[in-house]
């Protein structure tokens, strides 16, 4: 089995977002707009948290998959490539968490 990456999923989301034959959940979600997609992302985040708190490993896996998928849909609608998010993670992990937090702008 070849390794499946988030970049693979990002490509699939982009392909399916443009489908017009009514067969794609992704296209349907994108057509409903960012508010709906973000709401779904939030729902999946909560479901992932619940699975983790309950210690249900299988549900953590499936809900995490849903969470990552919906995050990539939200990023697609926002026109934010996954590489930008990965670059930010790389920037943050180049220093300790406390150093990164101290460098954030004050609210």
Swiss-Prot record:
Protein EC: 3.6.1.31
Organism: Brucella anthropi (strain ATCC 49188 / DSM 6882 / CCUG 24695 / JCM 21032 / LMG 3331 / NBRC 15819 / NCTC 12168 / Alc 37)
Family (UniProt): Belongs to the PRA-PH family.
Gene Ontology cellular-component annotations: cytoplasm
Gene Ontology MF: a single term: phosphoribosyl-ATP diphosphatase activity
Keywords linked to the UniProt accession: Amino-acid biosynthesis, ATP-binding, Cytoplasm, Histidine biosynthesis, Hydrolase, Nucleotide-binding
Pathway this chain belongs to: Amino-acid biosynthesis; L-histidine biosynthesis; L-histidine from 5-phospho-alpha-D-ribose 1-diphosphate: step 2/9
Leading EC class: hydrolase
Presence of the UniProt keyword Nucleotide-binding in the record: yes
Top-rank lineage group of the source organism: Bacteria
HAMAP family, A to Z: HisE
UniProt cross-references to InterPro entries, sorted A to Z: HisE, PRib-ATP_PPHydrolase-like
Any one of the GO BP annotations: L-histidine biosynthetic process
Entry annotated with the keyword Membrane: no
Transmembrane segments: none
Lineage summary: Bacteria, Pseudomonadati, Pseudomonadota, Alphaproteobacteria, Hyphomicrobiales
Reaction(s) catalysed by this chain's protein: 1-(5-phospho-beta-D-ribosyl)-ATP + H2O = 1-(5-phospho-beta-D-ribosyl)-5'-AMP + diphosphate + H(+)
Annotated protein name in UniProt: Phosphoribosyl-ATP pyrophosphatase
Gene that encodes it: hisE
Record localization: Cytoplasm
């Amino acid at each position: 089995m070849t390794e499946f990456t988030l970049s693979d999923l990002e490509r699939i989301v982009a392909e399916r977002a443009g489908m017009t034959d009514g067969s794609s959940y992704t296209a349907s979600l994108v057509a409903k707009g960012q508010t709906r997609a973000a709401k779904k992302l939030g729902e999946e985040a909560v479901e992932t948290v619940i699975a983790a708190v309950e210690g249900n490993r299988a549900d953590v896996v499936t809900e995490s998959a849903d969470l990552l998928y919906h995050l990539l849909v939200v990023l697609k609608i926002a026109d934010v490539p996954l590489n930008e998010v990965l670059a930010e993670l790389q920037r943050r992990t180049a220093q300790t968490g406390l150093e990164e937090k101290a460098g954030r702008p004050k609210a």
